[in-house]
């Protein structure tokens, strides 16, 4: 053991010290004797006693012996260190690693769940999951060489002032990851009719391979100058067509038709919602996830405390600009925290034009953190 070896080294050092004369000095050594002709005759006073220069040299410690003892101590410590049971740290998944599968058509990227992405129940939110998918979308386009001047625009799209806008998104969540987990996002694109592009996602637990989230979205082209929808030019189709695959993460029959709300049918209403400068992307377009945040403005906190979103459908009807003022409306079906809930949502401009319709389905959380909440409180409409 390290203790035994070090103790032996210290005993050796002690023996060296005891071998010196009674004054703690080393014995007289012939190699330190000075020639009589060269020996100085002057005497020096040390603590009131006169000593010659030759005698002073005799009183110096034997540094070679001390150095040998110190070397022995360090050698013993180093030997014991190499004998310890040392194991290399397990290799972590390569975070933020981009790679492809299915002959280069399925893009994969891993994400570590950060502390700022989890809530009071220690799980991620639907917004954090959608942020990961949005980041994978842009890196997918960049990796296959179809990323132009803007986010998600190809070179031919940039020449024609075109950009992709999301028309519909559906997310189905089986389980939310927690802080410290690592997830892998898979995404791929395919055709949707004559003028649409479909993008599908699978989010997996890197440790177990379990599918946590499935998502599909439909995008169409919009002219950045006229802000009107456009057909897909042949040149653009030639850029993105080779990356299309015929596979879906969510079937169309899983997506239910959305209901229209108005002031008389909504349970919760909030107005005065406006986009800010940091809500815009490089295309001067309000980020899609900002619409989701506005939808949640009229969802009671009690629902977030007792339920998770199990599915989420969004239909974008109109673009809002930086000067827009919006209203968020929500109606809730069901009233017990022990059963599933369904919420219908609407975002509209202050003038009444629809911006977005949405539907969220909620399932009870498995934790007991909020067991005290039994019913969803009625709140007055504003």
Curated annotation (Swiss-Prot):
The site feature described as Important for catalytic activity is recorded at 281, 283, 285, 319
Reaction(s) catalysed by this chain's protein = dodecanoyl-[ACP] + H2O = dodecanoate + holo-[ACP] + H(+)
State the species of origin: Umbellularia californica
State the family it belongs to: Belongs to the acyl-ACP thioesterase family.
Q: What is the effect of changing residue 219 to W?
A: Reduces catalytic activity 75-fold
Q: Tell me the enzyme class.
A: hydrolase
According to UniProt, the name of this protein is Dodecanoyl-[acyl-carrier-protein] hydrolase, chloroplastic
Tissue pattern of expression reads: Expressed in developing cotyledons. Not detected in leaves.
- UniProt subunit comment: Forms homodimers.
From which lineage does this chain's organism come?
Eukaryota, Viridiplantae, Streptophyta, Embryophyta, Tracheophyta
Q: Which Gene3D superfamilies match?
A: Hotdog Thioesterase (3.10.129.10)
